[in-house]
Amino acid sequence: FLMILPFLILCFLFSYFPLHGWIYALYDYKAPLKLSQCQFVGLKWFKTLFSNKTQVMQLIQVMKNTFAMSLLGIATSFLPVLFAVFLNEIKCKWFKNLVQTLTTLPNFISWTLVYSIAFCLFSTTGMFNTVMQNLGVISEPLKILDSGRHVWLQMILWSTWKGLGWGAIMYLAAIAGIDQEMYDAAKVDGAGRFQIIKNITIPSIMPTYFVMLMLSVANFLNNGMDQYFVFQNAFNKSTIQVLDLYVYNIGMTGRSLSLATAIGILKS
């Protein structure tokens, strides 16, 4: 018991103790007042979620965005696997290290900096529009960032670019753990590179992939908000707003911290 006691304490402090904040969903809380100074409203905010037509429509759109981004994330979860396999096939050590470093580096860049890069490249005055206009390909700048069209595609592309190299590290470790005698035996039998990948490498890392896939499914509603927050603007707000960002917008910049708490409870 003493060995697991530190784990139990940390689990309580970080997983259960913060739940006392759920009580705000039962009050009409107005910052910076104390909770005792606010009116007790019971289940009012929970009823508002399903009785207010505007609120219901917003919530439906938010859930649609959340489900879409989660499904796209799951659908592209195989990309780090393929990248790890191809990276493992690079025989030139220095080039392999260079590629791995360059593809892992974006993971350590904040989403604020990623948006700055996107703005420099794809804003109406950015490099892409400037080059296309100078070449005569387009007459008017394309509103890539200032539009609600293709937002889901943009988000998954930026997310893939940022996390591809980092996501491949675990699969590279799994590949390193494969028994080399299997490769030697396959080469003796005359198997080619693609046959070895198909019959040895990929099947051997599938258990790792399915574990990561199950973790992704378990966090289906947890898209985070950093990426969507920095890319959010008045033009794409309706299509980029996922559940975590919606809770933030309502609680910090919207109508009510209490309503945001109620939505957070339903998410849990």
Give residue ranges: language-model regions.
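A structural signal for multi-pass alpha-helical bundles of membrane permease subunits
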Residues: 1-268
